[in-house]
Amino acid sequence: LAHVATSLELVATTTALEPALVLPALASPPADTLSLIERRRSVRAYADRSLTLGEVAGVLRRSHAREPSLSRATRTHVIANRVAGMAPGVYRYDPATGGLALSRAGAQGLESGRAGLDQDVVAGAALTVAVSFDRASLRVEGARAYRQAFIEAGIIGARLYLGAGAEGLGGCSVGAFYDEELAHLIYAGADLLV
């Protein structure tokens, strides 16, 4: 996440998003939150396999199971590289419907790795999640909106770890990336901050 002042140039265009698929309902029973917190770790070496659509649904639905606490300006983007039942591409997740709207088709592992400062942990991931902010929502939310959106993004990140753990998966938060490359990759446009 970065402030507009750190961006060299904003992406000039945005693309209307069409719903591509709706994620299945949670298949696994609720996990014990305290044990998930206790086991929570960053994982930088991943199994060489595709994720299932059910696993992706579990991670995303759990990470957005509650309404935003501080800010409604956050937007969640999914870069799917190896997910069975899901075409490779960049999607925007709608927590209200559980839907994913395709914003860029095709495998984006190399591009996401480049955007993530050429880190293999990003390029080799079956799935990468990025959080951006909607500028219009930030303006509406007032003076503390920018700060609160960062806190909300952190809450989403923590819940992503717990959602991954509940699905028997691992993940690694990466806060180092190139603003412009990530903005272009997720088609952030002039209305979103990455």
Short names for language-model regions:
Residues 170:
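Residue-level detector of anion-binding/catalytic polar loops
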Residues 1-153, 167, 175-194:
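N-terminal accessory segments that position/regulate proteins before the catalytic core
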